[in-house]
């Protein structure tokens, strides 16, 4: 099995990258892909860049060039669920765009023409992630993750997301674009991210302060999940 892992930022991939043995670096389309073995398992780790276009471009290049069997999207996210705090884990059961609006033509809010309203994560990957969470004794929430090209840092943006997606547990800027590409390529995916901030008026301060905490937690989760997927 070859496992594809995608993170947007240097801070979100550096801990994993440093653990890859026999590492080789591929630079394509402004993205960097690091291939090798993570605890004996073949992996391809992508640093995509921030935002939906960068994530979609990177995911496509990763899938075409490295042919992974599954995709794990890792990194940080803003918490929406009331039980979440910095360092907690969110696992996707579905991903949707929070900034797409073609409702004038009868589509659901967040749905693009020719696409499902939401992109469902793979049940087996979800189950494996939740098993890792239990083993590591982490606080976690599974649910809807929403994505858009905006850092949510104020009451107006937060209220809009809560109104349109009352069940959303986290918000970030890449996951749904990655899920969209995986859907088109028929490759299973799951989003496993750690909370770096709570999406409110102080979220930019929290993000800067706690990104390292989120990166450490998400790296622990992904490393454990890769082991479980490879060896059961």
From Swiss-Prot:
Gene Ontology molecular-function annotations: adenosylhomocysteine nucleosidase activity; methylthioadenosine nucleosidase activity
Binding, substrate: 78, 152, 173-174
Reactions catalysed: S-adenosyl-L-homocysteine + H2O = S-(5-deoxy-D-ribos-5-yl)-L-homocysteine + adenine; S-methyl-5'-thioadenosine + H2O = 5-(methylsulfanyl)-D-ribose + adenine; 5'-deoxyadenosine + H2O = 5-deoxy-D-ribose + adenine
UniProt cross-references to Pfam families, sorted A to Z: PNP_UDP_1 (PF01048)
A biological-process GO annotation: purine deoxyribonucleoside catabolic process
Enzyme category, top tier: hydrolase
Pathway as given in its UniProt record: Amino-acid biosynthesis; L-methionine biosynthesis via salvage pathway; S-methyl-5-thio-alpha-D-ribose 1-phosphate from S-methyl-5'-thioadenosine (hydrolase route): step 1/2
Cross-referenced InterPro entries: MTA_SAH_Nsdase, Nucleoside_phosphorylase_d, Nucleoside_phosphorylase_sf
GO cellular component, one term: cytosol
CDD domains: MTAN
Gene3D superfamilies: Nucleoside phosphorylase domain (3.40.50.1580)
Family note: Belongs to the PNP/UDP phosphorylase family. MtnN subfamily.
Known function: Catalyzes the irreversible cleavage of the glycosidic bond in both 5'-methylthioadenosine (MTA) and S-adenosylhomocysteine (SAH/AdoHcy) to adenine and the corresponding thioribose, 5'-methylthioribose and S-ribosylhomocysteine, respectively. Also cleaves 5'-deoxyadenosine, a toxic by-product of radical S-adenosylmethionine (SAM) enzymes, into 5-deoxyribose and adenine. Thus, is required for in vivo function of the radical SAM enzymes biotin synthase and lipoic acid synthase, that are inhibited by 5'-deoxyadenosine accumulation.
Protein known as: 5'-methylthioadenosine/S-adenosylhomocysteine nucleosidase
Source species of the chain: Salmonella typhimurium (strain LT2 / SGSC1412 / ATCC 700720)
